[in-house]
A protein has these predicted regions:
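Phosphate-binding glycine-rich/basic clefts of nucleotide- and phosphate-handling proteins
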Residues: 36-122, 130, 140-141, 146
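Catalytic phosphate/nucleotide-handling subdomain of diverse soluble enzymes
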Residues: 157-165
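Short glycine-rich phosphate-binding loop at a beta-alpha junction
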Residues: 1, 139-153
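A short acidic Gly-Thr/Ser loop motif
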Residues: 21-29, 34-38, 50-52, 152-155
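Conserved mixed alpha/beta catalytic, RNA-binding, or beta-rich assembly cores of soluble enzyme
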Residues: 22, 122-123
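Conserved helix-loop functional segments at active or binding sites
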Residues: 8, 131-138
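Conserved phosphate-binding catalytic cores of ATP/NTP-utilizing and phosphoryl-transfer enzymes
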Residues: 1-22
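Short acidic, glycine/serine/threonine-rich loops at helix termini
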Residues: 12-15, 33-35, 44
Length: 165
C-alpha cells in the first residue's frame, strides 16, 4: 500500500487522530486531514505554492528592488534556506547578501525581499486549510484547527505556523 507523505508524517509523529498536516516541499505543498485511517483523495490537497515558487519570487523581488540584479535559482534557494521568515518574525539583523548588479559586485539588504517572497505561499495554504476543515465533519473542526502539523523543508520558515493560524 502506498500512503501520502503527509499521512506518513502524522503516523511517524503518532498524531493520526484529527490532525491536519501541511507538508511544504520543493514543488508542491501537500495538505492532508488525518482521521485515524488512511486518507481518501477527498482528505488531501496539493498546491503548487512551495519552495520552488518562493525561490522564483525571491529572484523577482530582488530584481524589482535592484534593477539589473543577477541572481540564480541556487542563490535564491540558499538565501531562502538560511534566512526565510514571514510576518513579524523578522531577524534582528538585516539579511545582507552578495550578488552582482550589471557585473558589479554588491552587498545589499534583501530582508524585505525574503519576507515578501515567503509570504506568497501563505494565502494559498490558508485557503486550502479552510477548504479541508470546512469539508470535514463539523464535530472535528476544532480538533483539526488545534492539531496543525507543519512538515517538509518549508516548515523551517520562521513565523509561518503563527501566520497560518
Amino acid at each position: 500500500m502506498i500512503i501520502s507523505e503527509p499521512f506518513a508524517v502524522a503516523y511517524a509523529l503518532d498524531k493520526i487522530e484529527h490532525s491536519l498536516v501541511i507538508d511544504i516541499g520543493a514543488g508542491t505543498t501537500d495538505l492532508c486531514r488525518v482521521y485515524g485511517t488512511v486518507p481518501t483523495p477527498n482528505d488531501q490537497m496539493h498546491i503548487n505554492f512551495a519552495g520552488d515558487h518562493i525561490d522564483a519570487q525571491i529572484i523577482t523581488e530582488i530584481q524589482r528592488k535592484y534593477a539589473g540584479a543577477q541572481i540564480t535559482k541556487d542563490m535564491a534557494r540558499r538565501w531562502k534556506e538560511s534566512h526565510s521568515f514571514v510576518g513579524g518574525a523578522a531577524p534582528d539583523d538585516p539579511v545582507i547578501v552578495d550578488f552582482s548588479i550589471e557585473g558589479k559586485a554588491m552587498s545589499l539588504d534583501i530582508t524585505d525581499c525574503i519576507s515578501a517572497a515567503c509570504e506568497t505561499i501563505v494565502e494559498p495554504i490558508v485557503a486550502s486549510v479552510k477548504e479541508l476543515v470546512t469539508g470535514s465533519n463539523p464535530e472535528y473542526h476544532d480538533a483539526f484547527r488545534r492539531n496543525v502539523i507543519l512538515a517538509g523543508g518549508g516548515s523551517g520558515i520562521i513565523g509561518l505556523g503563527a501566520l497560518i493560524e
